[in-house]
Amino acid sequence: MYAVFQSGGKQHRVSEGQTIRLEKLEVATGETIEFDTVMMVADGDNIQIGAPILEGVKVKAEVVAHGRGEKVKIVKFRRRKHSRKQQGHRQWFTDVKITGIA
């Protein structure tokens, strides 16, 4: 059984027991969270597709950890002008473990 839900402007395909990395959520570590923007649920040959969201279906997950991703370097370089600008960025993320699809 798997489901497709939306979080942080992205769609994620998950199954029970899977750990995924989402955009930062303002939820404490160890707490349970429910995602109600489920777009599709498949259980064998039984497939339900929302238009765009399924009513009454939720994906339950437990927050495992928060953190920051790898650094991405941004470089702006102008040739022959002796001009260069460097910047770095580390995106916040939340790891969640899917506990149920109902």
Curated annotation (Swiss-Prot):
Pfam families: Ribosomal_L21p. The keyword Aminoacyl-tRNA synthetase does not apply. One of its GO terms (molecular function) is rRNA binding. One of its GO terms (biological process) is translation. InterPro entries: bL21-like, bL21-like_sf, Ribosomal_bL21, Ribosomal_bL21_CS. Keywords: Ribonucleoprotein, Ribosomal protein, RNA-binding, rRNA-binding. It comes from the Bacteria. GO terms for cellular component: cytoplasm; ribonucleoprotein complex; ribosome. This protein binds to 23S rRNA in the presence of protein L20. Belongs to the bacterial ribosomal protein bL21 family. Part of the 50S ribosomal subunit. Contacts protein L20. This is Large ribosomal subunit protein bL21. It comes from Proteus mirabilis (strain HI4320).
